[in-house]
Amino acid sequence: MRVGRIARIDTGRRARTGVPEVVLGEGKDDEHLVAILRALAEDGRGAVVSRPTRSQAQRLGGLARAATLPLESLAGGRVWWLRGMPDGDPPAGVVGLVTAGTADVPIAEEARAVLQSVGATTVEAYDVGVAGLHRVTRAARRLERSHPRVYLVFAGREGALPTVWAGLVRAPVVGVPTSVGYGRGGRGEAALNAMLQSCAPVAVVNIDAGVPAALFALHLLTGSSPDE
């Protein structure tokens, strides 16, 4: 779908890959973003808007309040959901979301919002970092009862939680380094490096990449059935 000279929207992404259309707000002109969303809405299609700027979020909020577009704010405004006609069944299986600290929760909630937009089921354990190992083991036992097919584990600072978590659970673990931390190795750098050097099997995405982590989890859910 073409939107003037500014965009070519992939309307077959969900059917082809199992993941929703995601429109990145960051770097786009506000009017261009709105034009893209209007075109999607007119065609009855949904989308996720990730990382809107402050002015974009204000604009989207105004459109939502006026009921001009079927928009919903998720994850504290870090993600917006343009609701459209159903274009597929909810993915089978559960995604576990785990954070080391409360400061990592906003990135985890970005991921949860993307998963929520397509009806995926999630279970969460927040603020269960390795500074209190009793919290980690207790949370792992609780979430394992839901039999997640993949875990997204978010951690800043030293980034140790994904490695520990991967040693406790059966499902694959995706480490998501967050930009929590300061000084040398801060802003997620030490966390990213630690996860890349994990001795336990952990896949790793970029710093603060909650949305890509969620999309990867959806690929795992839709790429095979739970019985395969």
What does each model-identified segment do?
Residues T99, A140-L143, V180, R184-E228:
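C-terminal binding/interaction regions
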